[in-house]
């Protein structure tokens, strides 16, 4: 028996252990799971013949399509494809996740082909970038009305907000931004949606990246206004140099871009966090200000500058969960970062939830859905714009993972660090001199918050393998066969990046310097102070007025538009 162990069983066991050792590190190192991937994008044409005609005419040029935005709702995963180059047949698309659980699915135009006709301003969307689904089952899409990029840009249509009812798949509103809200340099690529006490109490905020402004839109008033007189919207002249995928380039003119909204605070409003693209710093303002049209020229001191994230910390996309965890892309680092908003905004309180020098090259968009699942789209954008993509390789990927899994064992996971549950802080609130109070009754107290923290925790992140091609773990997702939850690790070895170690500061009232934090003061804005984290008590938004919850099924729609084009 012992001889058999040495000659038969043990070698087999050794091979098994080696195989496990090869598989487990990849699974352990990667938290984001690859769901979809493409060498080049494909679209769900009504027929093979129409697809061939589109290819022959140049209406469809597969290598010209780049995905930039992602959003999840029910059984649909929305993907936007801007018309930067010729041959983009649809700009607002989705994947039917019931029909395509993984792989490289065709993109289905939403809500149909006709609604994606370039230049049909009143009836269609010409170019969409980032999009947002709100808790009322509405999809918010800003049509930039542009075709081309940079010096090739033309403007066949004005900027227009399009809102779709996702239960009926119909557009329920279109609002053109007035000339006063834009300027000759305007380029708007990002959106944040703020739902207040009900679905009619809704605002959308738009970041004018190259026109250096912030636009507010009120659903109830069907009106918009622009905040533009603030230097925080401008790029940092010292942060215009970028390095992505071995390409050095300069985006020195890129201003306000990424935005996220906190949960509702005790005063009934949220905080909007934002960053210029050419910057490593985050800024903040209360939506109390943004919702008030009278404050557009009288709000300079209501905007507050936070600390920098650290080196190589450019970001284009950010989102915050309803319990205060902010996720953001780190495009220089091929990574997704995190910050818990109950902690000071300083590098020692920022974590890395995932990094991949192949799969996460330019993680263009980051979203958290209604089930607290995270979705990340990576697209190698600088390579697409400044060099040439290898279309025999996988270029575009969509990843997903539960938020709790991503932040586990990072400084953003307050359940497992030395800080314990955050203490409640209440900040005096009143209207600024000369301005009436807007919104719900104010919450006041004179108690000052002092954090008491124990020994500083140490959080380290190991390096991630350079590629991954396995299926995601899908346990718990409705409508998805359980057999697909097994991982199929096909990753290949490659260069390993250096590990990163981050530790937090020891903070306490015993004479040790406390990290800087930001809290709302009595002047209706934000104040810079050093007494510890800003811990805003949160109230949950009013539940959706829609009966029956979110719709979770949609059929692929074919309007017959392509047949009409062929006949015409």
Swiss-Prot record:
Compartments in which it is found: Secreted
Alphabetical list of InterPro entries matching this protein: 6-blade_b-propeller_TolB-like, Royal_jelly/protein_yellow
Source organism, top-level taxon: Eukaryota
Glycosylation sites noted in the Swiss-Prot or TrEMBL record: 151, 222
Signal peptide location: 1-28
Primary location recorded for the protein, binned into one broad class: secreted
Disulphide connectivity of cysteines: none
Listed Gene3D superfamilies: TolB, C-terminal domain
GO cellular component, one term: extracellular region
Entry keyword set: Developmental protein, Glycoprotein, Secreted, Signal
Recorded family membership: Belongs to the major royal jelly protein family.
Function field: Controls the pigmentation pattern of the adult cuticle and larval mouth parts.
Protein name: Protein yellow
Native species: Drosophila guanche (Fruit fly)
Gene that encodes it: y
């Amino acid at each position: 028996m012992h001889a058999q162990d040495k000659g038969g069983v043990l070698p087999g066991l050794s091979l098994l252990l080696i195989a496990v050792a090869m598989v487990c590190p990849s699974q352990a190192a990667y938290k984001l799971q690859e769901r979809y991937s493409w060498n080049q994008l494909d679209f769900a044409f009504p027929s093979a013949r129409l697809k061939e005609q589109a290819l022959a005419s140049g209406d469809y040029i597969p290598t010209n399509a780049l995905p930039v935005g992602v959003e999840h709702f029910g059984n649909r995963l929305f993907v936007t494809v801007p018309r930067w180059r010729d041959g983009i047949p649809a700009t607002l698309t989705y994947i039917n996740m019931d029909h395509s659980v993984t792989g490289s699915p065709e993109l289905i135009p939403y809500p149909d082909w006709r609604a994606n006709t370039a230049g049909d301003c009143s009836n269609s969307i010409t170019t969409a970038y980032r999009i947002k689904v709100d808790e009322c089952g509405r999809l918010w899409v800003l049509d930039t009305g542009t075709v081309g990029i940079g010096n090739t840009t033309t403007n066949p249509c004005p900027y227009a907000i399009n809102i779709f009812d996702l239960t009926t798949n119909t557009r329920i509103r279109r609002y053109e931004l007035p000339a006063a809200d834009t300027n000759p340099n305007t380029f708007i690529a990002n959106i944040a949606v703020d739902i207040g006490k009900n679905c009619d109490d809704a605002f959308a905020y738009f970041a004018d990246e190259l026109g250096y402004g912030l636009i507010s839109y009120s659903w109830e008033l069907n009106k918009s206004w622009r905040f533009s007189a603030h230097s925080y919207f401008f790029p940092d002249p010292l942060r215009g140099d970028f390095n992505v995928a071995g390409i050095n380039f300069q985006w020195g003119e890129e201003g306000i871009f990424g935005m996220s909204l906190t949960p509702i605070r005790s005063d009934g409003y949220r905080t909007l966090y934002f960053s210029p693209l050419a910057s490593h710093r985050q800024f903040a303002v209360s939506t109390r200000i943004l919702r008030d049209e009278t404050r557009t020229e009288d709000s300079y001191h209501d905007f507050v500058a936070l600390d920098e994230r650290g080196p190589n910390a450019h970001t284009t996309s950010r989102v915050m969960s309803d319990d205060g965890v902010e996720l953001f892309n780190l495009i220089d680092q091929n990574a997704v970062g995190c910050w818990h908003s109950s902690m000071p905004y300083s590098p020692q309180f920022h974590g890395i939830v995932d990094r991949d020098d192949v799969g996460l090259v330019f993680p263009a968009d980051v979203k958290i859905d209604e089930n607290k699942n995270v979705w990340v789209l990576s697209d190698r954008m600088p390579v697409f714009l400044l060099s040439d993509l290898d279309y025999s390789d996988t270029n575009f990927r969509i990843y997903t993972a539960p938020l709790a899994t991503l932040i586990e064992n990072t400084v953003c996971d307050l359940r497992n660090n030395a800080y314990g549950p955050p203490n409640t802080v209440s900040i005096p609130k009143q209207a600024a001199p000369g301005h009436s109070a807007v919104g719900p009754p104010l919450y006041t107290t004179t108690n000052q918050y002092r954090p008491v923290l124990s020994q500083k925790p140490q959080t380290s992140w190991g390096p991630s393998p350079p590629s991954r091609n396995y299926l995601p773990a899908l346990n718990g997702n409705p409508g998805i066969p359980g057999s697909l939850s097994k991982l199929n690790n096909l990753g290949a070895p490659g260069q390993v990046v250096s590990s990163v170690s981050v530790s937090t500061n020891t903070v306490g009232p015993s004479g040790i310097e406390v990290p800087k934090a930001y809290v709302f003061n009595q002047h209706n804005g934000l104040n810079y102070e050093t007494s510890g984290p800003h811990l805003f008590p949160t109230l949950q938004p009013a539940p959706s007025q829609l009966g029956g919850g979110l719709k979770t099924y949609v059929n692929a729609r074919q309007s017959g538009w392509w047949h009409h084009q062929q006949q015409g």
